[in-house]
Amino acid sequence: MSLPLFALAALAEIAGCFAFWHVVRAGGSPLWLAPGVLSLVAFAALLTQVEADAAGRAFAAYGGIYILASLGWMWAAEGVRPDRFDALGAAICLAGACVILFAPRG
């Protein structure tokens, strides 16, 4: 099952992007960039391990997981609680990701 890999990839991507955000937008130390780059490399490596017959399909399905994980990060790390529109948007995206992941293909 690809779901645990998608979740780990999302955590790695968000952590890596947040490191850059912290340096550029919040004035954080440039030392944040090293773990940020490592996290982004881990993200790419993890995404290559998911079960998919095409890279584009893996990336598209991952998008729904990424959106949900991003909202979780926003709440847990940034202290901003998602509102009902965030939740609705995430639900729609997850439904789309499920169609991509679980559709019967012949």
UniProtKB/Swiss-Prot annotation:
Provide the transmembrane region boundaries: 4-24, 27-47, 58-78, 84-104
Which Pfam families does the entry link to? UPF0060
Where in or outside the cell it occurs: the entry states:
Cell inner membrane
Q: Look up and give the membrane topology term.
A: Multi-pass membrane protein
Give an example GO cellular component term for this record.
plasma membrane
Using the record for this protein, list the coiled-coil segments as residue ranges, or answer none.
none
Q: What is its main location?
A: membrane
InterPro entries per UniProt: UPF0060
- Top-level division of the source organism's lineage: Bacteria
Q: Which keywords belong to this entry? A: Cell inner membrane, Cell membrane, Membrane, Transmembrane, Transmembrane helix
**Cross-referenced NCBIfam families:** PRK02237.1 (NF002586)
Query: Mind telling me which PANTHER family this protein's record contains?
Result: UPF0060 MEMBRANE PROTEIN YNFA
Family per record: Belongs to the UPF0060 family.
Query: What is the protein name for this chain?
Result: UPF0060 membrane protein AZC_0909
**Organism from which the protein derives:** Azorhizobium caulinodans (strain ATCC 43989 / DSM 5975 / JCM 20966 / LMG 6465 / NBRC 14845 / NCIMB 13405 / ORS 571)
